[in-house]
Curated annotation (Swiss-Prot):
Family of the protein in this entry: Belongs to the ATP synthase subunit s family.
Job of this protein: Required for the assembly of the mitochondrial NADH:ubiquinone oxidoreductase complex (complex I). Involved in the assembly of the distal region of complex I.
Lineage: Eukaryota, Metazoa, Chordata, Craniata, Vertebrata
Protein name (database record): Distal membrane-arm assembly complex protein 2
GO (cellular component) term, any one: mitochondrion
Record bears the keyword Mitochondrion: yes
């Protein structure tokens, strides 16, 4: 029995030696293996970049859908409760504030306020500062024929096309703030000539307006009975568009 045991022991040592040799040879990099690794890395980067692009497009479409949903028409509410409750509900859902005639400001987090009982009380002021309101969402505010104060400052989706619809509020609107809206240009401000009842207009800090000082002069001529708030036009005429300091003062901000 000693011979078979010795033979098995010798065979085991030879097998392990071959295994170690094979393992040591596998550690040597060949040109073919390097090229394969490069192809694998390039494929990974290509697939990963495609995934990132797809993810960005998905998130963009999701954001667009969210804004569209937030600006949907409140037709059923309007049919049941009328334009005042519809406009108020829309703004409160957006995170803004509303003021009915003879009442205090109502904000989203206020408790103890039921706007359903104010169905026949006109809305006289709306603060939609920073809200996601767009062209479609304005349809919920335009029926507010007694609206006197409207703040749309820092609204990221408000553009020139939106301003072209504000003529429907010309009969009552007296104060309007467009300060800090990034998509409003001179073309949109030209649409405000319909608002002859305006007494105060804030057009400060509009980055899409290339010549703020000159634009303010033209708006003042267009609305002679309105106080137009904006940059110091004398300074803006001397400075280039890239050298103008931002105007952070806004009397309507609170």
């Amino acid at each position: 029995m000693a011979a078979p045991r010795a033979f098995l022991h010798l065979g085991a040592r030879e097998w392990h030696g071959r295994a170690r040799g094979t393992h040591s040879m596998s550690g040597l990099a060949t040109p073919d293996s390097n090229r394969e690794k490069k192809r694998t890395l390039l494929q990974f980067l290509s697939d990963h970049f495609h995934d990132v692009q797809t993810l960005r497009e998905y998130l963009l479409q999701k954001q667009i859908s969210k804004v569209s949903m937030e600006n949907r028409s409140y037709r059923k509410i309007q049919e049941r409760y009328g334009p005042y409750i519809t406009g108020a509900q829309f703004i409160l859902k957006q995170g803004g504030a509303v003021k009915f005639q003879g009442r205090d400001w109502i904000r989203p987090n206020d408790r103890g306020h039921s706007i359903a009982e104010l169905q026949k009380v006109p809305v006289e002021a709306v603060d939609a500062s920073g809200c996601a309101i767009n062209y479609q969402g304005l349809s919920n505010l335009l029926p507010l024929k007694e609206l006197q104060f409207l703040s749309l400052q820092r609204c990221p989706n408000l553009d020139d096309w939106c301003l072209s619809r504000l003529y429907l509020l010309a009969g009552s609107l007296q104060e309007l703030s467009l300060a800090g809206c990034p998509r409003i240009s001179e073309r949109g401000l030209a649409c405000l000539h319909h608002l002859q009842n305006l007494r105060r207009l804030d057009i400060s800090d509009l980055p899409a307006v290339s010549h703020p000082g000159l634009t303010q002069i033209l708006v003042e001529e267009m609305l002679p009975h309105c106080e137009v708030l904006g940059v110091d036009w004398a300074k803006s005429l001397k400075l280039g568009p890239d050298d103008q300091p931002p105007d952070t003062s806004s009397p309507l901000s609170s």
